From Swiss-Prot:
Residue ranges that the Swiss-Prot or TrEMBL entry lists as coiled coil: 46-66
Coiled coil in keyword set: yes
Domain of life of the source: Bacteria
Encoding gene per record: greA
NCBIfam families in alphabetical order: greA, PRK00226.1-2, PRK00226.1-4, PRK00226.1-5
UniProtKB keywords: Coiled coil, DNA-binding, Transcription, Transcription regulation
UniProt name for this protein: Transcription elongation factor GreA
Length: 158
């Protein structure tokens, strides 16, 4: 079984979502199903059908989260002795050599990735180009719009 890399924060967020689904959403949908059943004929009961559909989604998501957490490889970047190299969980400041703009990214697992928050998936082209590099290096990224070059300004393990 392949391990799924997660940062400590990513694992916490999945655990929180799982807890919310089990302790709030699941009981609410069970109550909604019971309420809909009390209205009689289930064959044409839209409330019942909607509640059952919602229950299926909730149970599926609970299963998915439990699986992900069971195969998670939780990585704390502050505990990695990467000696200045960019690794999973690293936060890196880059300068786009074409635009001279600075961007900050954290390299995270697939479930945590959110470009708007500066979190990029470890399997993305930019993350793959950065892994193993260190401050002062230049990374070439094969992007859909062509090759982009970035200077690595700072590497942090936070």
């Amino acid at each position: 079984m392949q391990k799924i890399p997660l940062t400590v924060r990513g694992a916490e967020l999945l655990k929180q979502e799982l807890q919310q689904l089990k302790s709030v959403a699941r009981p609410e949908v069970i109550e909604a199903i019971a309420e809909a059943r009390s209205h009689g004929d289930l064959s044409e009961n839209a409330e019942y059908e909607a509640a059952k559909e919602r229950q299926g989604f909730i149970e599926g998501r609970i299963s998915e989260l439990e699986h992900k957490l069971s195969v998670a490889h939780i990585i704390n970047p502050t505990e990695i002795h990467a000696e200045g190299k960019i690794v999973f969980g690293t936060t890196v400041t880059l300068e786009d050599l074409e635009t001279e703009e600075h961007v900050i990214y954290q390299i995270v697992g697939e479930d945590e990735a959110d470009i708007k928050q500066g979190k990029i998936y470890v399997g993305s082209p930019i993350a793959r180009a950065l892994i193993g590099k260190e401050e002062g290096d230049t990374a070439e990224v094969q992007a859909p719009g062509g090759v982009r070059e970035y200077d690595i300004i700072e590497v942090r393990y936070i």
